[in-house]
């Protein structure tokens, strides 16, 4: 049973999963290592109502907190983690990345956060689930299967122009001795270039940031009717791919999304598509407490219409 998402191409980047009645996405590139539980939520399978329906994961968009609590419980059951072990970002479009310890467990879900301005999280603690939020911005997920370190970062246009993906990789190197050549990196569901119009000042920031870098020819383009207004179409997927490659991530270890949030309003939240009337999607990433290469998933997950075993 497939969720029904529209894809930009035929590449197999994601597996569509349903567990405990909750649809979500997984990356085969991460799953095959047998080291993590992970998933990216859709807007389906929760209890929130109206434009927040139904799997809203934000406590700050006017939802009933009891609904959000239940949504977290459902996501936790679906991907195999515990709400009290989740740790959430406090996203303000920075490039600040926090090292998460066992003492942080539950922050943002079962207890208050004691930090602000954090758009990325890194941990090497098994059982701690990193949670980041999106509704057009770019999810970035990382796994070093050698050092057994995971990271999750939020990269909107501000984070992207300021190299959020690269900053995260550098933090993994500095704090945990990770080698970029070993790191698996995933660029998640977010708004595609076709749907993402930006102003000339944003375009200029990207032109400056990527000046002299190869592979940027299609990063920005203008439709004929946009020239008078100084508007451009920006490719956040390519921008993040370029930063990650520049950080040392190898092509065979990098997966770039082919799912656009704005093209899938029935299944994913999109800020642009709904003029801000939306909930938040979540990306969940957790080192297994007994993770070993090649370990199997729990029963009950359906993968693109076929039972995993």
Where do the protein language model's features map onto the residues?
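Active-site microenvironment for binding and transforming phosphate-containing groups
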Residues: 1-309
């Amino acid at each position: 049973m497939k969720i029904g998402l529209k894809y930009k191409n035929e590449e197999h980047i994601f597996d569509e999963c349903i567990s405990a009645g909750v649809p979500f996405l997984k990356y085969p590139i991460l799953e095959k290592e047998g080291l993590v539980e992970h998933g990216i939520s859709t807007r389906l399978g929760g209890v929130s109502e109206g434009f927040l329906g139904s799997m809203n994961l934000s406590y700050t968009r006017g939802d009933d907190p009891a609904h959000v609590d239940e949504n977290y419980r459902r996501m936790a059951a679906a991907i195999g983690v515990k709400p009290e072990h989740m740790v959430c970002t406090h996203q303000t479009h920075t490039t600040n990345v926090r090292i998460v310890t066992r003492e942080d467990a539950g922050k943002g879900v079962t207890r208050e956060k004691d930090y602000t301005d954090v758009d990325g999280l890194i941990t090497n603690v098994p059982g701690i689930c990193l949670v980041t939020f999106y509704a057009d911005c770019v999810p970035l997920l990382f796994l070093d299967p050698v050092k057994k370190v995971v990271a999750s970062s939020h990269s909107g246009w501000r984070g992207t122009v300021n190299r959020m993906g690269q900053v995260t990789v550098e933090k993994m190197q500095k704090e945990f001795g990770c080698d970029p050549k070993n790191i698996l990196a995933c660029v998640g569901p977010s708004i595609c270039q076709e749907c993402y119009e930006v102003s000339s000042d944003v375009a200029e920031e990207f032109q400056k940031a990527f000046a002299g870098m190869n592979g940027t020819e299609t990063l920005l383009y203008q439709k004929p009717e946009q020239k008078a207004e100084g508007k451009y179409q920006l490719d956040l997927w390519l921008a993040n791919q370029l930063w990650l490659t520049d950080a040392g991530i190898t092509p065979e270890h990098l997966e770039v999304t082919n799912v656009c949030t704005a093209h899938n309003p029935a299944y994913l939240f999109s800020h642009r598509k709904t003029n801000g009337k939306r909930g938040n999607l979540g990306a969940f990433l957790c080192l297994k407490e007994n993770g070993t290469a090649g370990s199997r998933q729990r029963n009950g997950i359906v993968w693109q219409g076929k039972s995993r075993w």
